[in-house]
Amino acid sequence: MKYLKTIGKVLAAVAEPLRRNCAFAVFMYMLGCITAWATLPDARGAHLYDNLYLELFLDVYVLTLILTVLPRKVMIWVRGFFYFALYATAVVDVYCFVKFQSTLTPTMLQLVGETDSRESGEFLRSCVSPDVLLSNVGWVLLLMFVHIISALQLRFPHFIPRRWRELIKSIWLRTCELLRRARPVIGTAVLALLVWSVCASAHNKVATHKLMSGTTIGEVEHTLTEKDHAVLYQPIYRLVFSIYANTLTAMQIDRLVRTASKVQVDSCSFRSPNIVLIIGESYNRHHSSQYGYTMPTTPRQQKLEKQGRLVKYTDVVSPWNLTSFVFKLLFSMYSVGDKGEWCDYPLFPELFRKAGYHVTFITNQFLPKAKEAVYDFSGGFFLNNPKLSAAQFDTRNTQLHRYDEDLLKDYDELQGQNTDHNLIIFHLLGQHVQYRQRSPKERKLFRGDDYKEMKPNLNARERQTLADYDNAILYNDSVVTEIVKKFENEDAIVIYVPDHGEECYEGDMHFFCRMHSAKIDARLAHAEFDIPMWIWCSRKYIKKRPEVFRQVVNARNRRFMTDALAHMLLYLGGIHARDYKEQLNLLSPEYDENRPRILKKTTDYDKL
């Protein structure tokens, strides 16, 4: 009997937080469910978080436990704070999903910080507009309304009609009596649910802690590439993560801004009047017919190569297989193995501007937008920060496009701002997943059936994905060739290099995209780090600078990793600065070809 009493007390104690905070628990659980349902994308394959209901129960229970152990006077204020934070975050999160098709992101929070009072007022007015009230936001607002009415009924019963009061009182008394009689059963159920939810949610809680423990935004991003990364399934988690991500980027931005203020150029000979850098995306070198691939994916570039002014490089690798990591190393004068971090060094466009070049940046990826994923946020924050953007670029495009060819129209509009000495950077969407969306329908050449003999191990869907990828490369071939044509009659040099490679059913693999968490072996490096690279020179350029073109040709078979690209660019600009290193300049006779090419700071490419 004593044991039964002890068990009864334990069960009662377990259920006590929910009993004391019954209204809080019910409404907050309903809020969690409603926001999850309201932010479920209307897309094929979209589904709710698998552990939504159990983990939500655990989270709500923890909040009620906190309220239970607090003194009553303190508890009232803390509970009010919980209500405000959770309801407000839910409204904003669902509103963002309705308006921007994305829940809260670090970029959204960054954009909020840049709004003025007028824009804030417009946002608040839009929240109460009929179209918003009738959207999924309305469900959250309806729950708030019901919650407020129920709270008013308890505190100010005379506001409620007498018949309603009697009905509510009757229901309440019957419910309380039922709960009193069922207390042992309820205690057992709560304990069982609690144990179950802890076991089911432990992995995500550990993963969330790991995500929130990163020391840099790059580390956080890499954590998100892991297969079992944290699921931020509630608005409040997404808000906290967004604040955390912005805090991490702010630290690196501060260092970059300090470095930018100290940038110095010793001299500049303007060796190349027009330098054009084209940065591609997700380009597996072994899918380029220019490098021996079976399918004719690069006919235009091969034609340029046969004309003798396009020089392809045969042994180039990327230091990472993540765009944001590569971009930081491409733009910074830092190279793998240097002391400190990439953000402790100047960005090469800053040096070009300081030297007197007019710098243009035309991107089809890194413009700040509300629904920007953390990957783009991490890769573009140092390009889009107002101070750093002003330090790097004189001219930028202002909108993204569905297809890369529209960047040429952007350049046509901005070309009038060019000066005698120009650095022009094109950043393409290239072969970024989804491959099918990277080329217009009328420009597609390859079909899934074309790969039956080449890839008999693939099914029809996989062969079509492979065809989509090759069609994206073929379309990219036309885009980069059109960019080259823009400078045919100029005194110009054009460099093409993608950020990293890409898996697309290599060998016997049934996989596309990239394996961020896998150990790097020769096969993976072959697919995800081997990239194409070439340099094209106009006739005017070759005629005036035959020695530079000779250097370009002589370097074509050298081993190279693109973290050192900035040093070659400074050489082409004739820029002498403290951070320039001759041994990292691919075109220099002093270039150190034996420098280790370390992939992801872990693996020596040349020892695989």
Question: What spans do the regions from the language model cover?
Answer:
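Polar, surface-exposed loop/tail segments
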Residues: E506, F549-T562, G574-K607
